[in-house]
């Protein structure tokens, strides 16, 4: 294998794969025709990420298949590009049918990036799902890989004029930063190959050093966890409620690598204010600076947060201003006071229409012996002429329900037990990444662990008469940050089967990273810690003081102030 060098240093092997890929084509088509294996070769398994897919296998049956001298049960996970999380009822129905009939797991997974994933797609079914998405006006381009990922924004664009405007902006940003290569259409949609020279004026022929994430938030609600992103845009309104521009945050990211203290979660830094009409120029300039300055030697240090720390805010700001031809103005005052979704019925801009946020535990839309979520949503989609909107907390909004249809849909919700009247505030404040059995990076359970674990936490809360309170609790199977555990009041990250690192001290509004409290401990040990600290909190907290704020004030953990300096202290 030929290793690429630049400035006499070895580049990451991903750089070789991208450079030799012919603008993301590789030999994917050849692998699609290879019936001897259910997967793609090593290089193509990286390239299909740029087309919105991950190669995975079912880890529950990996050993059994190995004993039978079979290759792992290789399958793909596909992630749709859905800026702002908006999907029509008809699109939902078609996706629901495909997931039911053509995937191994018959489920739809709502994600913290405000889109849906389909797990368990076998290689012969791949062209079918891409062609279905295309027929529906959707695609999965650039939802993985070293590109700008799905752009997220505060969930319900029909809540106010500003919410609608930021949804429109999320779509514009997504389109503006898409790869220009025709590889997706040629491979998956059988589009005729035209002899022409591909060009990537924004991303370059080797794309970005690592993934890039953008979020747009409307204060005072930080439902998107805006500080966790490479680029965060905080909407600023004038005195009449009109959107005038954005405070710009740069350099957030929650992933880290165990044992490597040069990696750490980091909250984005404030850079300044930019007027609405100029925001696309700034977004493009931030992307191109990261494209050119990001670390292509060590992927652990390739994210924007490390670029910022390496050169400093002042130098990075000056380069962005030079490239955009704009100047950052001072930040406008803003404040976040809450996260999470607003469950239940609300009216929006048009008083004739209703919107209902449903709790979907861990975002897993499936039918079980206890509840027919998938069937219920399918029946609603058949009579609902509006939209479904996915939230960044893995929940679902049935939106734009006309007054005339409200009773019909409410009856269906009751029939299938979807109203969630029995769901506690604590459960609504908890979420997990997928982890086992499909994620190859998972070290411990997360999605399958969380429901029973939350029940145990609820028992602790009840023990201290805290049933009406809630703690933001998040679990991930590894330290990569998918469920944003590094902005939770209680964060668990998997270390091994049945073992987790326990982090405490994040806050309610998503503006503080928690600190490691106990390392590599079992569920029983975690619950013992929580019993003691929650009991302390119940006895000694100030009025309305949250758990995360209490454990910091009480000295149970020290606040993380500047994570590149004090996260590991």
Curated annotation (Swiss-Prot):
EC number: 1.8.1.2
GO cellular component terms attached to this protein's record: sulfite reductase complex (NADPH)
Residues binding siroheme, per UniProt: 482
Listed Gene3D superfamilies: 3.90.480.20, Sulfite Reductase Hemoprotein, domain 1
InterPro entries per UniProt: CysI (IPR011786), NiRdtase/SiRdtase_haem-b_fer (IPR005117), Nit/Sulf_reduc_fer-like_dom_sf (IPR036136), NO2/SO3_Rdtase_4Fe4S_dom (IPR006067), NO2/SO3_Rdtase_4Fe4S_prot (IPR045169), NO2/SO3_Rdtase_4Fe4S_sf (IPR045854), NO2/SO3_Rdtase_FeS/sirohaem_BS (IPR006066)
Cofactor note: Binds 1 siroheme per subunit.
UniProt-annotated binding residues for [4Fe-4S] cluster: 433, 439, 478, 482
Reaction equation(s) it catalyzes: hydrogen sulfide + 3 NADP(+) + 3 H2O = sulfite + 3 NADPH + 4 H(+)
Broad class of enzyme this protein falls into: oxidoreductase
4Fe-4S listed as a keyword: yes
Entry's Gene Ontology molecular function annotations: 4 iron, 4 sulfur cluster binding; heme binding; metal ion binding; NADP binding; sulfite reductase (ferredoxin) activity; sulfite reductase (NADPH) activity
Pathway: Sulfur metabolism; hydrogen sulfide biosynthesis; hydrogen sulfide from sulfite (NADPH route): step 1/1
Record key words, sorted: 4Fe-4S, Amino-acid biosynthesis, Cysteine biosynthesis, Heme, Iron, Iron-sulfur, Metal-binding, NADP, Oxidoreductase
Pfam families: NIR_SIR (PF01077), NIR_SIR_ferr (PF03460)
Needed co-factor(s): siroheme; [4Fe-4S] cluster
GO annotation terms (biological process): cysteine biosynthetic process; hydrogen sulfide biosynthetic process; sulfate assimilation
Family membership: Belongs to the nitrite and sulfite reductase 4Fe-4S domain family.
HAMAP family (UniProt xref): CysI
Stated role: Component of the sulfite reductase complex that catalyzes the 6-electron reduction of sulfite to sulfide. This is one of several activities required for the biosynthesis of L-cysteine from sulfate.
Assembly: Alpha(8)-beta(8). The alpha component is a flavoprotein, the beta component is a hemoprotein.
Name this polypeptide is given: Sulfite reductase [NADPH] hemoprotein beta-component
Source species of the chain: Blochmanniella floridana
């Amino acid at each position: 294998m030929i290793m690429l060098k630049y400035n006499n240093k070895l580049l990451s092997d991903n750089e070789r794969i991208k450079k030799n890929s012919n603008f993301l084509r590789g030999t994917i088509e050849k692998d699609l025709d290879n019936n001897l294996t259910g997967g793609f070769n090593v290089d193509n398994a990286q390239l299909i990420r740029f087309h919105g897919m991950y190669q995975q296998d079912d880890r529950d049956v990996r050993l059994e298949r190995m004993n039978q001298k079979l290759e792992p049960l290789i399958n793909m996970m596909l992630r749709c590009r859905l800026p702002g999380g908006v999907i029509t009822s008809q699109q939902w129905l078609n996706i629901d049918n495909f997931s039911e009939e053509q995937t191994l797991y018959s489920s739809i997974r709502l994600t913290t990036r405000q889109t849906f994933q389909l797990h368990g797609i076998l290689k012969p079914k791949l062209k079918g799902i891409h062609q279905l998405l295309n027929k529906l006006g959707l695609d999965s381009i650039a939802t993985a890989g070293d590109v700008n990922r799905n752009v997220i924004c505060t969930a319900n664009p029909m809540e106010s004029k500003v919410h609608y405007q930021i949804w429109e902006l999320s779509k514009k940003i997504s389109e503006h930063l898409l790869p220009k290569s025709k590889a997706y259409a040629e491979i998956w949609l059988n589009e005729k190959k035209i002899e022409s020279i591909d060009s990537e004026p924004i991303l370059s022929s080797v794309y970005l050093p690592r993934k890039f994430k953008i979020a747009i938030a409307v204060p005072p609600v930080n439902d998107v966890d805006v500080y966790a992103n490479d680029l965060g845009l905080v909407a600023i309104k004038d005195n009449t409620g009109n959107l005038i521009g954005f405070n710009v945050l740069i350099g957030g990211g929650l992933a880290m690598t165990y044992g490597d203290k040069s990696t750490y979660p980091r909250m984005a830094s404030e850079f300044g204010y930019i007027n609405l009409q100029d925001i696309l120029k700034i977004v493009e300039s931030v992307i191109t600076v990261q494209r050119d300055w990001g670390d292509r030697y060590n992927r652990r240090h390739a994210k924007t947060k490390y670029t910022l720390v390496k050169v400093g805010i002042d130098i990075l700001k000056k380069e962005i201003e030079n490239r955009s031809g704009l100047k950052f103005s001072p930040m406008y005052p803003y404040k976040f006071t809450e996260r999470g979704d607003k469950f239940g019925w609300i009216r929006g801009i048009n008083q004739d229409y209703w919107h209902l946020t449903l709790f979907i535990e861990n975002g897993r839309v499936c039918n079980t012996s206890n509840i027919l979520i998938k069937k219920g949503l399918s029946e609603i989609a058949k009579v609902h002429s509006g939209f479904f909107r996915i939230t960044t907390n893995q929940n679902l909004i049935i939106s734009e329900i006309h007054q005339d249809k409200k009773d019909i849909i409410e009856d269906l919700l009751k029939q299938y037990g979807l109203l969630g009247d029995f769901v506690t505030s604590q459960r609504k404040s908890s979420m997990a990444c997928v982890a086992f059995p499909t994620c190859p990076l998972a070290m411990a359970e997360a999605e399958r662990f969380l429901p029973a674990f939350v029940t145990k936490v609820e028992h602790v809360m009840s023990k201290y008469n805290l049933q009406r309170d809630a703690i933001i609790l998040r679990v991930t199977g590894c330290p990569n940050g998918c469920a944003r555990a590094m902005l939770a009041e209680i964060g668990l990250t998997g270390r091994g089967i049945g073992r987790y690192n326990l982090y405490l001290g994040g806050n309610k509004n998503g503006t503080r990273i928690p600190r490691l409290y106990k390392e590599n401990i079992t569920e029983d040990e975690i619950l013992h810690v929580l019993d003691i600290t929650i009991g302390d909190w119940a006895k000694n907290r100030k009025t309305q003081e949250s758990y995360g704020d209490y454990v910091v004030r009480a000295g149970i953990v020290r606040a993380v102030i500047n994570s590149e300096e004090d996260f590991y202290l």
